[in-house]
Amino acid sequence: MIFQRTVQKMVKATGVGLHSGNKVTLSIMPAPVNTGIVLVRTDLSPAVAIPAKAEQVRETTMCTALVNDEGIRISTIEHLFAALAGLGIDNAVIEVDAPEIPIMDGSASPFVFLLQSAGIKEQAAPKKYLKIKRPVRVEDGDKWAELKPFKGFRVNFKIDFAHPEIARSQQHVVMDFSTSAFVKEISRARTFGFMRDIEYLRANNLALGGSMENAVVLDEYRVLNPDGLRYEDEFVKHKILDAFGDLYVAGHAILGEFTAYKTGHALNNQLVRALLAQQDAWELVSFEKEADVPVSFSVPSGAVFA
């Protein structure tokens, strides 16, 4: 039996909000089986809980944001959710004392470290996977994203930027997911942005917390960060990281192949919504025997922490 997972103990971290520039404290706590991921705004009185579900994603401009019916939001969830997905955390309560998750270093790596520090605990209930039964596709102009059947979880992602530095890098990655591959090859990829856009955003009181400490910054020709890139193909890998986080609002790890061209938060969420709306396109499955589990999910998360 493959079991659901939560964290063993509460852990906290403090960072800055990407858009506000203000200090943000984040706490991750264990949760009972079948809870899913629930985010809680503790800066409000009373505190407001928002379950992480696809229909709660109501803002996808520059980030993924959960918004409840009263308009209360928690923004920039995607890097944290990529870490939760990558380490196979099914259940957790996440408290934050601000309208956004701290940006940390612009990747999922600090959240991976935080979850590893908390420890991962198996729970007395079967883990459920969302198995793709037939292709589901969404399009927006020349951009598109698709989920189709596959035994495991494979990502086939291509970006297309005319910027000379990005054009020189590899812009197409195909990888079979595993916790180890996520931690080593994807989790450290940082968000990236262009100086021309940053100047405009700050003039409009956005990206006030953005800096070279938490993003790859480019001018018209090159990367401006003194230490350069973490991966030769960091740009496309960060887009994969974002997609991991965006897809996890489906509520379960996906068994299927995710293929995408030039997608972002909006199209990723549209794909999840389209999938869940077509109930003949998926089913929830569990695995009684570990031998039956696809290789992508067969190694417990803790195995890569030793």
Curated annotation (Swiss-Prot):
InterPro entries: Ribosomal_Su5_D2-typ_SF (IPR020568), UDP-acyl_GlcNac_deAcase (IPR004463), UDP-acyl_GlcNac_deAcase_C (IPR011334), UDP-acyl_N-AcGlcN_deAcase_N (IPR015870). One of its GO terms (cellular component) is membrane. Keywords: Hydrolase, Lipid A biosynthesis, Lipid biosynthesis, Lipid metabolism, Metal-binding, Zinc. Pathway: Glycolipid biosynthesis; lipid IV(A) biosynthesis; lipid IV(A) from (3R)-3-hydroxytetradecanoyl-[acyl-carrier-protein] and UDP-N-acetyl-alpha-D-glucosamine: step 2/6. It catalyses: a UDP-3-O-[(3R)-3-hydroxyacyl]-N-acetyl-alpha-D-glucosamine + H2O = a UDP-3-O-[(3R)-3-hydroxyacyl]-alpha-D-glucosamine + acetate. SUPFAM superfamilies: Ribosomal protein S5 domain 2-like (SSF54211). Zn(2+) binds at residues 79, 238, 242. Catalyzes the hydrolysis of UDP-3-O-myristoyl-N-acetylglucosamine to form UDP-3-O-myristoylglucosamine and acetate, the committed step in lipid A biosynthesis. This is UDP-3-O-acyl-N-acetylglucosamine deacetylase. It comes from Shewanella sp. (strain W3-18-1). The gene is lpxC.
